């Protein structure tokens, strides 16, 4: 992802595509049609006043004084749009933010994950650490929980199953879940099947691969119900054979599976790729 002259770009298959033209912008609950970040801010809060902007050119040139001055003169609750195309530019931004904070400024961030890595001053994750982490599972099989149903996720899922033909794929019928409102026995049966599968190999637990919505429910409400069902399945897995590792795909899914499915309250983040 890159932001240049206020436009947020996404690199897809070697081609830069404006974020508003990606499938993520067509989300039924969080979608948007704004080309620039300034337009996006205006559509969300309505006439927020003058929006300051820091250019990628200033960040690329390492003009710390100019970048810091933009932050220092920003008034209370003023929006500042950041343009950046690489981590070196984000490092300059972080340095300017820290200088401005030393002078009393306080900032609230609405960002992509790349900024978190820059703000925490982390380098790219060491793949050796990931390999060592995976090898600590004492040979137990893994569980992949897929709640996201975007086109990108489907491509990734198909690629994984194609390259790992021995992995077992089980599906939660989300439309039946949403239509019934009470899917307890089916969730227990699916949990048993996942547990039996983990005894023999790794398992993919996926939701129906198309977006589904319950009667008189918004997509967001439906998504929360589906996520809760995945959590219930995970919580009912047999305790004598837990998965050696877990991959959770989807923003809501990854949070809920970790926090509510496995009761994890604190983790170590190895890095942002």
Predicted regions mapped to residue ranges:
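General beta-strand structural signal in soluble alpha/beta enzymes
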Residues: 49-56, 80-84, 107-112, 117, ...
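Short, flexible loop segments at boundaries between secondary-structure elements
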Residues: 111-139, 270-273
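A glycine- and small/hydrophobic-rich beta-loop-beta segment
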Residues: 132-230
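A glycine- and small-aliphatic-rich helix-loop capping segment at beta-alpha/alpha-beta transitions
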Residues: 6-18, 124-129, 260-271
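Cap/lid and interdomain-hinge subdomains that line or gate substrate/regulatory clefts
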Residues: 1-90
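Active-site pocket-lining segments that scaffold enzyme catalytic pockets across diverse folds
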Residues: 78-104, 110
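Conserved, well-ordered active-site substructure
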Residues: 243-245, 249-273
């Amino acid at each position: 992802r890159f932001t240049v002259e206020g436009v947020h770009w996404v690199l897809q298959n070697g081609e830069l595509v404006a974020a508003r033209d990606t499938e993520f912008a067509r989300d039924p609950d969080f979608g948007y049609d704004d080309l620039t970040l300034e337009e996006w801010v205006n559509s969300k809060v309505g006439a927020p006043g003058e929006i300051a902007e820091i250019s990628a050119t200033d960040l690329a040139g390492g003009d710390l004084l100019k970048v810091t001055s933009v932050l220092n003169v920003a008034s209370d609750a003023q929006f500042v749009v950041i343009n950046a195309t690489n981590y070196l530019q984000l490092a300059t931004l972080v340095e300017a933010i820290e200088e401005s904070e030393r002078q009393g400024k306080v900032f609230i961030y609405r960002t992509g994950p790349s900024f978190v890595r820059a703000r925490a001053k982390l380098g790219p994750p060491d793949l050796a650490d990931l390999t060592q982490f995976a090898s600590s599972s004492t040979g137990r099989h893994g569980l992949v929980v897929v709640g996201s149903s975007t086109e990108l996720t489907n491509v990734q899922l198909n690629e994984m199953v194609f390259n790992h033909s021995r992995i077992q794929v089980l599906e939660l019928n989300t439309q039946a879940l949403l239509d019934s409102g009470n899917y307890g026995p089916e969730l227990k049966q699916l949990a048993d099947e996942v547990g039996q599968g983990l005894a023999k190999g790794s398992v993919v637990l996926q939701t129906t691969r198309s977006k589904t919505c319950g009667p008189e429910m918004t997509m967001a409400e439906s998504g929360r119900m589906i996520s809760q069902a995945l959590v219930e399945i995970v919580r009912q897995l047999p305790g004598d054979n837990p998965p050696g590792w877990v991959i959770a795909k989807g923003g809501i899914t990854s949070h809920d599976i970790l926090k509510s499915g496995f009761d994890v309250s604190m983790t170590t983040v190895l890095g942002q790729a």
